Regions:
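Non-cytosolic membrane-interface motifs at loop->transmembrane helix junctions
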Residues: 16-27, 81-94, 143-153
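C-terminal ends of transmembrane alpha-helices
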Residues: 2-13, 65-84, 127-146
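Secondary-structure boundary elements
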Residues: 47-52, 113, 128-131
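Lipid-exposed faces of alpha-helical membrane segments in multi-pass integral membrane proteins
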Residues: 2-5, 29, 33-36, 60-70, ...
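Alpha-helical transmembrane segments in multipass membrane proteins, preferentially the mid-helix core
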Residues: 40-44, 70-77, 94-120, 132-139, ...
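A loop-to-helix transmembrane entry motif
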Residues: 58-64, 82-100, 116-123, 150
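Internal transmembrane alpha-helix with an interfacial aromatic "cap," most often the third helix
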Residues: 2-21, 25-59, 70-77, 104-107, ...
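Membrane-helix interface segments
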Residues: 52-56, 117-118, 144-145
Length: 166
């Protein structure tokens, strides 16, 4: 919601160009909170399937999360500027995509191995969220309406949370 509310308001009023700082701050906050969300999903997986050990996976999860957060903190992201470089949007999302892929694979494999009907679609919710998110990262600055894909992305995350609370 940190970026959806300003985006929706801007699109319904005077336009995105008048809300650059609010959108940028919202994107920054969301970048950090979504990284934490994926760490939490990793622990949902560990708890759900009673995983012990797997130190290498835990290190990979924390390494990708730390790298993502560090990259988000660089001033080159120019979060509050209209001309924020696409390159930094890509850089900071590479470790995030790897983190997401790790979580996707873990849930997909474990749900199949355990014949877990309740969590059988968890992996798909994450795939969908990235499917809606990647075009926004790549094209929302040149085709602002693409930013509306954040709405179905958010719906995918709601589905993720609903599965988690079953």
């Amino acid at each position: 919601a940190f970026h959806l509310v300003p985006r929706a308001y801007a699109l319904c009023t005077t336009g995105l160009e008048n809300y650059t700082a609010a959108l940028g701050i919202g994107k920054f906050i969301t970048s950090i909170t979504m990284t934490v969300f994926y760490i939490l999903l990793y622990y949902v997986w560990r708890n759900r399937y009673k995983i012990e050990g797997k130190k290498e996976i835990t290190i990979a999860v924390y390494l990708m999360a730390a790298l993502r957060i560090i990259l988000c903190l660089f001033p080159q992201n120019a979060w509050t500027r209209a001309d924020a470089p696409l390159s930094w949007g890509i850089y900071r999302n590479i470790p995030f995509a790897i983190l997401g892929l790790i979580v996707i694979v873990l849930f997909c494999r474990s749900a199949k191995e355990h014949k877990d009907r309740d969590f059988r679609w968890m992996w798909l919710t994450i795939v969908l969220s990235f499917g809606f998110y990647i075009p926004v990262v790549l094209w929302a600055d040149t085709v602002p309406a693409v930013g509306m894909l954040m709405i179905p992305k958010t719906c995918a995350y709601v589905w993720t949370v609903m599965i988690g609370y079953q």
